Amino acid sequence: MSKEVIVESFELDHTIVKAPYVRLIGEETGPKGDIISNYDIRLVQPNEDSIPTAGLHTIEHLLAKLIRTRIDGMIDCSPFGCRTGFHMIMWGRHTSAKIAAVIKDSLKEIAETTTWEDVPGTTIESCGNYKDHSLFSAKEWARLILEQGISDDAFERHVI
C-alpha cells in the first residue's frame, strides 16, 4: 500500500492569494520537541508574473546571507520552481509579521546598497550555475516588491 501524500502548496488556491506576502505554511515538531516552521515568501502574484531566473538566483544568494544577519534560526530559503517566491524553513516559531519585516529589510538592502561584491557564491567553485546571476534584475525586482509592500497575510492586504 502506498501512503497518501498531500503537498500543502499544491492545495493552496493560487487564484485568491495577494502577493507580496509572507504566510506560515505550517509547523512540525521533531522527536525531541524542536519546532520547524515553513513559510511561503511570495514575492510576485502567481500566474501573473515571475522573476527571471538570473535575478531570482541572485536574490536567493543574497537572502541566504541577509536573512541570517537579521534573525536566528534560518535553515533554508529556496526559490519556488514557478519563480514567484521562496520557501523558508526556520527553527522555532516566528510570526508572519516578523518574517515579513526581515524580508522587507533584506530587500531594501538589496535595492539600495548592495553591490556585486556583496553577492556571495558567484564563482565557479561556490555555485552550480555561477554565470546565471543578475544584480541589476535583483535590484529592480526588490524595488518593485517594496513598492507594493509586503503583507503578513496572504489573503487580505496587511502591509507591514
From Swiss-Prot:
It catalyses: S-(5-deoxy-D-ribos-5-yl)-L-homocysteine = (S)-4,5-dihydroxypentane-2,3-dione + L-homocysteine. InterPro entries: LuxS_sf, Metalloenz_LuxS/M16, S-ribosylhomocysteinase. Keywords: Autoinducer synthesis, Iron, Lyase, Metal-binding, Quorum sensing. Fe cation binds at H57, H61, C127. This is S-ribosylhomocysteine lyase. NCBIfam families: PRK02260.2-5 (NF002607), PRK02260.3-1 (NF002608). Homodimer. The keyword Metal-binding applies. Its cofactor is Fe cation. Its EC number is 4.4.1.21. Involved in the synthesis of autoinducer 2 (AI-2) which is secreted by bacteria and is used to communicate both the cell density and the metabolic potential of the environment. The regulation of gene expression in response to changes in cell density is called quorum sensing. Catalyzes the transformation of S-ribosylhomocysteine (RHC) to homocysteine (HC) and 4,5-dihydroxy-2,3-pentadione (DPD). PANTHER family: S-RIBOSYLHOMOCYSTEINE LYASE. SUPFAM superfamilies: LuxS/MPP-like metallohydrolase. It is an enzyme of class 4 (lyase). Binds 1 Fe cation per subunit. One of its GO terms (biological process) is quorum sensing. Belongs to the LuxS family. The keyword Iron applies. GO terms for molecular function: iron ion binding; S-ribosylhomocysteine lyase activity.
